[in-house]
A protein has these predicted regions:
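Positively charged
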Residues: 1-156
């Protein structure tokens, strides 16, 4: 496993559409392992392959001790709406309020090509939606309602 360099929002590569994964092999497994290590090193909760310079529809998400790898993720259903503060490992020094589904159902494959369906709510729904957007070249700042500015300590 290796830590990979993160592609930032000032690099036009991050806006490219990712391609479907067709080969579920050691190359993909190594990418997924590297993505997990890179995400942990950067203290993130999700990462898309495009964020480490690979145009493959592969994302990882880790929320509430649940670690997921989703290959070729496809949103089947979105229910409700929530507006929460988001950040991104590819977008430096900006956080903002983004509307996302309250519940999301996604079809994807695991690292071996086995198809599965998962439904996530709350923070998991946000994370899945955010990472799937990356596969389409969309960043959270494209959907941001307004920037989040934390209050400074000692201010009322």
């Amino acid at each position: 496993m290796a830590i990979r360099n993160i592609v930032y929002s000032d690099n036009e590569f991050i806006r490219k559409q990712s391609k479907k994964v067709v080969n579920f092999n050691e190359s993909l497994w190594e990418l997924l392992d590297d993505m997990k290590e890179t995400m942990h090193k950067a203290n993130g909760c999700g990462l898309a392959a495009v964020q480490v310079g690979v145009l493959k529809q592969a994302i990882i998400v880790e929320v509430n001790n649940l670690f997921l790898e989703l290959i070729n993720p496809e949103i089947l259903e979105e229910i409700g709406e929530q507006c929460e503060v988001e950040g991104c490992l590819s977008v430096k020094n900006i956080s903002g309020y983004v509307k996302r589904p309250k519940q999301i159902t996604v079809k994807a494959c695991d690292r071996y090509g086995n198809e599965f369906v998962i439904t996530g709510t709350g923070y998991l729904a946000c994370a899945l939606s955010h990472e799937i957007d990356h596969t389409k070249g969309i960043l959270f700042i494209d959907k941001m309602e307004r920037e989040y500015k934390p209050k400074k300590k000692g201010s009322n």
